Every structure is written in C-alpha cells, then in structure tokens.
Amino acid sequence: MSRPEYPKIASREQWLLARKGLLAKEKALTQQRDALNAERRQLPMVKVEADYRFQGPEGELNLADLFAGRSQLIIYHFMYHMDRGEGCDGCSCVVDNIGHQAHLHARDTTLVLVSRAPLADLQAFQRRMGWSLPWYSSLGSAFNYDYHATTDEQVAPVEYNYRDKAELERLGLNYHVQGEQPGVSVFLRDGAQVYHCYSSYGRGLEMLMSSFHYLDLTPFGRGEGWDGMPDLDGKGMHWTRLHDEYQQPAAVHDCCASTKP
C-alpha cells in the first residue's frame, strides 16, 4: 500500500485561522443536529397492535417485557447469519461500540439486540464476542418482517430504508431485497401498551458507531477511499471485521461488511 497523502504543513497562526473557520461550521452543524433531534422527538407514534413473541434466557417474552420495566426501548436489529453460524461483521462492530448500560438506564431507557435466529446460536456467538447486552430471538415471529429487518417477498412486501423493491433494484441495492438487514427501532411504553416511535437504517446507523466518530477526527478519517479519504487497505467501506479476526487473512462475502477469513 502506498503512503497516504498527508495534510499540508502550515504555521501555528495559519493552522489557528483554519481551525477557527472550521469551528464555526462545527457549531452550526451542532445547532442543526439539535434542531433535528428535537424534530425526531416530536414525531408521532404508532400503537403496536401485534402480539410479538421473543425468546430470551428467561423464556418467552412479549415486546413490553423487553423494556425491563423502563419506559423507553431501543432495539438494534442485529443481522445474524444462520448459514455461517455467526453475526454480521458490521453489526458486530456496532455492538462493540456500545458502552455501559447504566447511563441509558439512568434515562429510563433499555437497549437490546433482536435477531431472527435460534436463541442458542445467538448466545454462543455472544459468549465468543464477550458481550453482555440483552439479546433476544424473534425467530418464528413477524417482528423482523414488520420492521423491515428481514426482507423476503414470499412473506411480506419488500421495503428497506423506506424504499420498496423496485426502487432498491433501480438504485442497485439488491442486497437489501432478500435476507437479514441492519436497523434500529425505538419504542415507548405506557403501562402494557407499546408504541413505535422511530426506525432508522443504512447510514442512519452511523450515529451508533463511536469508533467512526473518533476516526472522523483524524487526517485519514475512516480510511475508506471516498470523500477525499485514503483507502487504507483497499477494501473501501468494507473493512470492519469481527474483533477476533483482524489478524486473519480476509476474503469477500456478501454481508454489509464484506471481508471474511
């Protein structure tokens, strides 16, 4: 790999002038983000009518049970590949970025993973990764299909990231037409009644990736070869791996992160 291009060298005075110019833009973006967050909070909510069932260490649960007594629930739709017997590299990177749950719990919020796979398989992979986040199986439930975390036109009309099958195919996003998909959904509970408030997919999930935000502070960025970044390993956006496999040779597969030993 050739040496990435470094930023030009400047005096401290020149650097400070450029930094203050960037700071003004950063502050404007922060204000825009605050306004967007406020608008997100004001979205209407939809009553959840279906009686979804999940499997967890405690046995069978319904959607309200996943709140663990709190008012707000965030579900990360984790792609688990039953054919490979392991989780998606990209989704695994998301979970690796999740910190201690106490801070969310202090805001009356529970965060869990949900996957359409056997619970025993999820638990085995969870042990391998060393995660403690609650993880539930939606296998046998319509939950994944209703919230577009699994696409299969034999079960339900295809939709991902608010695009139907025709639009996905027109945009060349054929990998979203069939199979497991990543996403995040937010629910609010009032007693036993649950409401759906928000779902996001695709690059909307980058807000969950603290490692990406750290890398965005650096001259090489994410090293993915777009928007002026160098491509540090020739894999573009598909460089993430399971955290215990970075030292192994990589091969291409069809997951959202496409390297695999």
Predicted regions and their residues:
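Catalytic nucleophile loop
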Residues: 106-122
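Non-globular targeting/processing and membrane-anchoring segments
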Residues: 1-73, 78-107, 124-130, 134, ...
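Residues at the C-termini of beta-strands that transition into short coil/loop
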Residues: 115, 137-139
